[in-house]
Amino acid sequence: MGCVTSQEDKAAVERSKQIDKSLRMDGEKAAREVKLLLLGAGESGKSTIVKQMKIIHEKGYSQEECLQYKPVVYSNAIQSMIAIIKAMGQLKIQFGHPDRAEDARQFFALAGHADEGEMSAELSGIMKRLWKDVGVQECFSRSREYQLNDSAEYYLNALDRISAPGYIPTEQDVLRTRVKTTGIVETHFTFKDLHFKMFDVGGQRSERKKWIHCFEGVTAIIFIVAMSEYDLTLAEDQEMNRMMESMKLFDSICNNKWFTETSIILFLNKKDLFEEKIKKSPLTICFPEYTGANTYEEAAAYIQLQFENLNKKKDTKEIYSHFTCATDTNNVQFVFDAVTDVIIKNNLKDCGLF
């Protein structure tokens, strides 16, 4: 009888050890699983960050995948030109050369029938002539007065290359493409022995109600702000300043009861565009109380402070801020490396392994 009890005790001890081991393994596995939620207003650069993860942490874009973006490149270039020509009418800007008015008429006729994935020599020729026109360039320089894609200048400057026979989009061309994100896009990758699940959520106001079920159990939120949009209004609401909308959204995320334990990482994005714009467009457009110089360093630091000051729990919650250029692979790689180190440290702490 005593022998049986002893065997039962041994079995119980063994079971207990197995349970402990299993719990430990589950804890370590949980510490290695990272759920990242990408949040931010529309057109802040969330989808570009997702594309960079594919380039940096997966195998990048194959030639076949790049070719799939060809229609998007053409569509972005054509839509940008359409936006500029239409804005010339609104802003009462004349073409520099009278022949360009006929080119514009031809352009609209051809643009509507452009074969998907192809750009005819006639269409590209017209677009090149229009893009060189001084009136078109004047209108482009006033793009804050209407809605224009960030990639407009990039593609229109590259018309020779992108309209050449046999054109295959480069990874940089792919990074610059703009397609509105609807719904939720999930990306998986492994980095530093961590298994990442990244969720890109539609930033336009109409999409926000779809976010909520992504929130539970999220490791960190990467909130993306387009710094260069301090002087722009929303595509969905011409009265609302984009930076103010971004701050409003950040306030609601940062101080949300669901995220008291969640790391908040702030990407102050489009720093390259901001650096160019701040020379011409004063920060007081968005922040009338700003008295600093219109230099990149001072103005960028001021924007960072405005966002960090929205944090109502400074004693217990830290905002990890980074200045980013989402189209610059090296910059994103460097920043994401730093972000991952913070996540590892916080994850191990949460799982009692640090």
From Swiss-Prot:
PROSITE patterns recorded: G_ALPHA
Q: Output the lineage of the source organism.
A: Eukaryota, Metazoa, Spiralia, Lophotrochozoa, Mollusca
Q: What does this protein do?
A: Guanine nucleotide-binding proteins (G proteins) are involved as modulators or transducers in various transmembrane signaling systems. The G(i) proteins are involved in hormonal regulation of adenylate cyclase: they inhibit the cyclase in response to beta-adrenergic stimuli.
Q: Which residue stretches belong to region G2 motif?
A: 173-181
Keywords assigned by UniProt, alphabetized: GTP-binding, Lipoprotein, Magnesium, Metal-binding, Myristate, Nucleotide-binding, Palmitate, Transducer
Name of the protein this chain belongs to: Guanine nucleotide-binding protein G(i) subunit alpha
Stretches for region G3 motif? 196-205
Q: Where is the lipid attached (S-palmitoyl cysteine)?
A: 3
Q: Could you mention a single GO BP entry for this protein?
A: adenylate cyclase-modulating G protein-coupled receptor signaling pathway
Species this chain originates from:
Lymnaea stagnalis (Great pond snail)
Region described as G4 motif: spans on this chain: 265-272
Read off the InterPro entries from this record: Gprotein_alpha_I (IPR001408), Gprotein_alpha_su (IPR001019), GproteinA_insert (IPR011025), P-loop_NTPase (IPR027417)
Q: Where is the lipid attached (N-myristoyl glycine)?
A: 2
Q: Which residues form the G-alpha domain?
A: 32-354
Pfam (any one)? G-alpha
